[in-house]
Amino acid sequence: DGDFDYVSKGDLNGNGLLDAYDIMSVAVALNDGVSPRKVENVAGEVTIEADKKQYNAGDVAVITVSGKGMKSVNGLSFALPYDAQEWEYVGVEAPALGQMYNMTYDRLHTNGDKVLYPTFVNLGEQPNIEGDATLMVVKMKAKKKQKFALKHTNGMLVDKHQNVVLF
């Protein structure tokens, strides 16, 4: 994939992606940086569910990303690969993520893979995500009649000290 050089320069955790972990390394230094005070290590469970199992052409899938037991979440990201012949990215809403900067990117890779990368990070010292919440809602438009079969990969929650929980 011709994206390797682009990704490799900023891929600090070596997973082949520019994700919340990599972005957090810079984001914690912005806007006067983050407080050195100790926080609990990041924790939480994330679930991703569509509103229906079956979609007709033109239907919009509402994909809810929920967090349970969130602690010290300063950034999060995941990848959602999809077939551009079957789905079209419509948008993402994330009111529960407060001041987090939305770096979501709908990317067509040089090898033809289409992947949505919902990515949110705090810039500098901002409130963390704590507790249970609907983290975001991703909307995808079906281009044909189909069952919902999209699966996320490379999900992570990151705290301001770059501790990580994978999902």
Question: In which residue ranges do the predicted regions lie?
Answer:
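Acidic, divalent-cation-chelating loop motifs in proteins
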Residues: 3-19
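Acidic, low-complexity intrinsically disordered segments
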Residues: 8, 20, 24-167
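Active-site-adjacent bridging/hinge elements
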Residues: 1-2, 112
